[in-house]
Amino acid sequence: MDKIRIVGGNELKGTIPISGAKNAALPLMIASLLTEEKLILENVPRLADVALLQRILGNHGVDITTNGKRNGDDPYAGQTLEIDARVIVDTTAPYDLVSRMRASFWVLGPLLARIGVAKVSLPGGCAIGTRPVDFHLDALRALGAEIEIDAGYVVAKAPQGLKGARIVFPKVSVGATHTALMAATLARGDSIIENAAREPEVVDLADCLIKMGARITGAGSSTIHVEGVARLKAARHAVLPDRIETGTYAMATAMTGGDVMLAGARPDLLESALDALRQAGAEIDATNEGIRVRRNGAGILPVDVTTAPYPGFPTDLQAQFMALMTKAKGNCRITETIFENRFMHVQELARLGARIHLDGDTAVVEGVERLTGAPVMATDLRASVSLVIAGLAAEGETMVQRVYHLDRGFEKLEEKLSRCGAQIERISG
């Protein structure tokens, strides 16, 4: 099993290209199931989750051609996928594939909307809380689907097709919003999705669906209107830049006292996180090239944050920000409101010398002057990269185990950091 070895103490200086967003690419790939015509996606990141979803779609009969690099010989350019879902040979998504990635559950809505039947295993993915699929199923039931749970599978039928409906989510859910949005595009009549997720990835999905012929208004607000259409057509769409990757490298730069240009990043996608970084003492400037992040030798200031649905502070940056706060000049409180059990990185950060106390859904971080390298173990995607950030600022060697989590969400992480001066390498074995 691969490990990542880090020798801390180096400032990050240089340019890090930001990849396409995984959390946008996955639902966009799944949206291909809604049409018999080709969907071409550009700027798709090269990640384990993307490769797994290609396998899952292939299981349904979808043909995917990878057209390599978009921009000449740039090794960091996103790949282009040409997706042809003209023929669906199987409407079952099996346990052995779906259990490995939660987002693969989203095939349920498009298959049901287009084919009228789907059988999808209950999902897997990161071990963060329970994250039930009830909101997805309730949305599809509202659209007229008949749904049963049988031996660990969701069996859904809509023999007469889906019908437009009013869908009200009791709590904001990005995944359920994706499901409702995709299914409603082919439903007969109008649908209104209330308390919808406002995340940029939802907007990106809506933008792509509109290019495919969907009639959608209100994406990015809490109320989305969808006028169903009979069919969707071919389209070409570029995946938006990854705001979580952007925030991660911005926090790593602030942690090491560096100066990094995050090329291709969009500041409008993560304003709350950038505001927190400014309060912590980082200098952040938007340019035509991307976002420049710097921190001088004044030290890191403590900042309280509470995770919240977009446009609030992203839960997917909570672990990384906690790593930054371990070296703050004072104490801060980090409150997690989105997922339970998302403090699994606390014990591992403590192995590096961090002082963190848990009080329910809040972590109280007492900043320390120095962290010391040690062997640590990743527990999930975002926790694993928080350990890398801490390792960059720790004295001595940090060895991060279970780095397969990183490969699910960060493209060429060691390469991007090492080109900016980090002493980091992957050790196979």
UniProtKB/Swiss-Prot annotation:
Question: Where in or outside the cell is it found?
Answer: Cytoplasm
Give the GO biological process terms.
cell division; cell wall organization; peptidoglycan biosynthetic process; regulation of cell shape; UDP-N-acetylgalactosamine biosynthetic process
Any one annotated GO CC term:
cytoplasm
Q: Which reaction does it catalyse?
A: phosphoenolpyruvate + UDP-N-acetyl-alpha-D-glucosamine = UDP-N-acetyl-3-O-(1-carboxyvinyl)-alpha-D-glucosamine + phosphate
The pathway that the record names for this protein is: Cell wall biogenesis; peptidoglycan biosynthesis
Q: Which residues take part in binding UDP-N-acetyl-alpha-D-glucosamine?
A: 102, 171-174, 316, 338
Please give the superkingdom of this protein's source: Bacteria
Is Metal-binding one of the keywords?
A: no
Question: So where does phosphoenolpyruvate get bound?
Answer: 22-23
What's one Pfam family the UniProt record gives for this protein? Answer: EPSP_synthase
One annotated GO molecular function:
UDP-N-acetylglucosamine 1-carboxyvinyltransferase activity
UniProt EC number: 2.5.1.7
Q: Which residues carry this modification: 2-(S-cysteinyl)pyruvic acid O-phosphothioketal?
A: 126
- Alphabetically list the UniProt keywords: Cell cycle, Cell division, Cell shape, Cell wall biogenesis/degradation, Cytoplasm, Peptidoglycan synthesis, Pyruvate, Transferase
- Enzyme class, broadest EC rank: transferase
Which residues are catalytic?
126 (proton donor)
Q: What does this protein do?
A: Cell wall formation. Adds enolpyruvyl to UDP-N-acetylglucosamine.
Name of the protein in its database record: UDP-N-acetylglucosamine 1-carboxyvinyltransferase
Q: Name the source organism.
A: Xanthobacter autotrophicus (strain ATCC BAA-1158 / Py2)
